[in-house]
Amino acid sequence: MIKVKVPGTTANMGPGFDSFGMALDIYNEITVEEIESGFEMLQEGELSEIPLAENLIYTTFLNTLNKHNYKYKGFRINLSKCDVPMSRGLGSSATCIVGGIFAANSIMGNVMSFDEIIKEAVSIEGHPDNVVPAIVGGMTVSIMDKDNVIYSNVTVPDRLRAFVMIPNYKLGTEEARGVLPDSYTREECVFNISRAAMLVNVMNNGEIEKLRLCMQDKIHQKYRGALIRNIDDIFKKAYEFGSLAEFISGSGSTLIAFIDKDNNEFYDRMKNFLDTLEDEWTVHLLKPNFTGAEIIKNR
């Protein structure tokens, strides 16, 4: 039996649209067992709503085996732990893709190199900002050079924590991309480029007091924010309670506030405020994950 543990991720992180991502200590775990014949996919909760042919764990796992002409009898696949919610902007699809590839590669005797795993995962996901940190951990900046994925790790300050706010409604990537404009002004592009560059340096230097300025954005958040109820009030309260910066996680609907680990009152104060809103919000106070995806059982 093989068990793969994959962290959820937050992507974009303000100005880093489709490029920046960070792994968080919230996880999905996938268990794979060999059986005599056929495929069994144990699907529970939100996953049970997805047809097998559209299940990213199943399709990625099977396609990876077939691509390498691996001969097999059958497998039972189970999403044995599902803490990363679907379609909420925390990289749920990346956990499924990465988990499927890692499980298949382990079964095949680790025939794929690290770079091959990353390239395959990005080709399925379509963009690198979630899958790269899910694989390597930490904060990453990723770019595409034709079919090649180039990434670099960014140092995350020890004091940084992510207060994650997950509403009880989904926001699909397709819908969230659909509200974005087809073009941007030069001023808007320069605004984001300068802040994205500054954000990397601020992270590397541990200058968390500068995060608010660096995480401003004019490319996607003002458009997607219209799809998330009470976002302005939530961000205003987070600022009032001492947040370092607030942003939409991925394409939404999850919101994140970066806080200093010593801000001991933030969790309770923010949760109490969210409880007054009409939607139900699940909250987590998370550290960055620095290990990325890993095989935690192989026997």
UniProtKB/Swiss-Prot annotation:
Its main location: cytoplasm. GO terms for cellular component: cytoplasm. One of its GO terms (biological process) is threonine biosynthetic process. The keyword Secreted does not apply. Pathway: Amino-acid biosynthesis; L-threonine biosynthesis; L-threonine from L-aspartate: step 4/5. It comes from the Bacteria. ATP binds at P85, M86, S87, R88, G89, L90, G91, S92, S93, A94, T95. One of its GO terms (molecular function) is ATP binding. Its EC number is 2.7.1.39. InterPro entries: GHMP_kinase_C_dom (IPR013750), GHMP_kinase_C_sf (IPR036554), GHMP_kinase_N_dom (IPR006204), GHMP_knse_ATP-bd_CS (IPR006203), Homoserine_kinase (IPR000870), Ribosomal_Su5_D2-typ_SF (IPR020568), Ribsml_uS5_D2-typ_fold_subgr (IPR014721). Catalyzes the ATP-dependent phosphorylation of L-homoserine to L-homoserine phosphate. Belongs to the GHMP kinase family. Homoserine kinase subfamily. This is Homoserine kinase. It comes from Clostridium novyi (strain NT). The gene is thrB.
